[in-house]
Amino acid sequence: MDSFQDTDHAELDRLVEGQLRAEHDGDVEAIVGSMAQAVVHDLVGSIDNPVHGLAAVRRRYHDVLAATVHERDVPVRRLYGPDFVLDEHIWSGRLIGRAFDLDGHGRRISHRAVWLLEVRDGRIVRETVWNDIESIRRQLG
């Protein structure tokens, strides 16, 4: 079993805010810059899940950011543990390509997103993301 050190809330907040800002800016290198070399990325509901390692996560984010324009996040709640943060927010933007098995055609969408970031030594070792796909389907339907 891995031994984790307590990570303070301010450090966890910096990680979450940095990830959100990097996604908003479309900056893949900033996104993966806070991740461990052996990071695991689990996009719940995705066919190719989970992906392992920085190269695979980098490719996934290139694909996601090519299909979406991240415009705004509205915080809902954030929960903390000694080695994780759970962040719930409302994601708003445009789906300009194909994502979640849906074609967006540039339409605006807004949905609930829940992120679980597991952290060791100040780096994200696992990121699990739940997007409210049914809400997205209803908006695009």
Each model region followed by its residue ranges:
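Short, surface-exposed coil-to-beta transition loops
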Residues: 71-73, 109-114
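Short, surface-exposed loop/helix-turn segments at secondary-structure junctions
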Residues: 94-106
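Short, low-complexity N-terminal intrinsically disordered segments enriched in polar/charged residues
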Residues: 1-37, 140-141
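Short beta-strand segments enriched in hydrophobic/aromatic residues
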Residues: 35-36, 91-93, 115, 131
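A solvent-exposed, acidic/Ser-Thr-rich amphipathic alpha-helical stretch
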Residues: 13-14, 28-82
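A short hydrophobic beta-strand element
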Residues: 83-95
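Hydrophobic pocket/interface hotspot
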Residues: 19, 31-32, 39, 53, ...
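Low-complexity, intrinsically disordered terminal/linker segments enriched in charged
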Residues: 125-141
